[in-house]
């Protein structure tokens, strides 16, 4: 049976986003301990190790202790490596020349008042047509599925999903839900390695916007998924979207569903979480 979410590949349009909120303490610890790329970690006192002789010479010239000079050098290096503005979601997914708009929510993309009287099938076609392109996925999610997914997202706002990378093993991605208002739910997806290195300055490569303006009237939620093709392929994003459905829309009445919900809970609680089990579920067809 085909998946309920229909996912044509569409076009990336301009949109602004708030900075990523702080995550749970366990999510931060997980990000800092789940990587085999230890050689990428920032080492302390690298300025001193590389430029010791120059530092001593400069310190003598300025009549200043080497430690004081070192602190200044490290501050400048951090400012150069991780400028605050460069890692914001706005810079990564929004064109710098995007025009400002007074429209908000779903009205940024489609006139809600005009489509309210249209049949659901027509709204779905218009939504797809509005989002045609290579760097976006769109979908119309039925009310029952969205409400179940939303309730789980509020219970478990953080999770990790792995993507297969052939002989290199897996590449983990950090999921973070955000709820700016009653009609919107945003899901930000960031490379776990990038989050480990940059923390709150890490920019999401994928942002899923859910608009529930028509939920009660038409029984659907409109989903728009923007992603950066330089960081993730459309196939990878589709795999993530389907995996999100598997876990956040899991049934409470089946063994598979119960195990998936248990994995969501385990990650939130920080106990007995098994990333390899998550990968196994992603390989399953159901």
Swiss-Prot record:
GO BP annotations, alphabetical order: mitochondrial proton-transporting ATP synthase complex assembly
InterPro entries, sorted: ATP11 (IPR010591)
GO molecular function: protein folding chaperone
Entries under Pfam families matching the protein: ATP11 (PF06644)
Subcellular localization, as worded in the UniProt entry: Mitochondrion
Entry GO terms, CC: mitochondrial matrix; mitochondrion
Highest rank taxon of the organism: Eukaryota
Disulfide bridge map: none
Sorted UniProt keywords: Mitochondrion, Transit peptide
Function: Essential for the assembly of the mitochondrial F1-F0 complex. May interact with the alpha and/or beta subunits of F1-ATPase.
Family note: Belongs to the ATP11 family.
Protein name: Protein atp11, mitochondrial
